[in-house]
Amino acid sequence: MRAQRGVALLLVLWTLATLSLLLGGLAGWVQLENRQAAWQRQHTQALLAAQAGVSLALQAVLDTRHRPRWMADGRVVPLAFDDAQLEVSVSSERGKLDLNAASAEDLIRVAQACGAERGQALRLSRALQARLANGATPLRVIEELRQLPGMTQTLYARMAPHVTLWSGLSRPDAAFASPLLRGALGLPSQTNAGGHDADAGSVLSIDSRAQLPGGVVAGLQTTVLLSPSEGNAQPYRVLRWQE
């Protein structure tokens, strides 16, 4: 009888221990789900704030009465939206190297300025020139650059901010070119190139970064084609959108 009672007690204790482990695991899972849901909610709020930064920049660019005029030279402008702190910049695509129009030598120079070795830059340039020379469809999205021989993830990350598909220029407009491009291609300084008086064109890139009080950050990069209209039509068309 005592042996049976001992076995029964062990079974009860084992059951209680198992239930405790299950309940502990369930509680931990619920806490993890709650943290993930809270982070997702805050990240969505930060992303919406970043989108608001894009809208504010577009409004300033399109409104000819806006003073001071928002220059498309890549400078970072601090803004506030509700509780979020924003950092927004506008860049003209005219100041970037057009992959579909640039010369082979210019592409090599820019790739090397971004850290590529000479041989790596040559492979990249030859692959792009061969594609364009054979009558294939020109690059339609910047991400296609990743597929070319000689391209690495590190090199792509360095080159992407300095290249475009929408300027149509054989060389970047020095008035809007980055210091890296001006140095690599021997372009004149922004002051000598016209600076604030230069035409930024109709294709702009907007980079918006939002940070909430809790530290959650979200970023948004978009390229838009401006099409000012006095009617109800949207005054711009999105060419590229990356969160």
Residues covered by each model-derived region:
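N-terminal leader/signal peptides at the extreme start of proteins
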Residues: M1-R5
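Compositionally biased linear targeting/interaction segments
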Residues: V7-E243
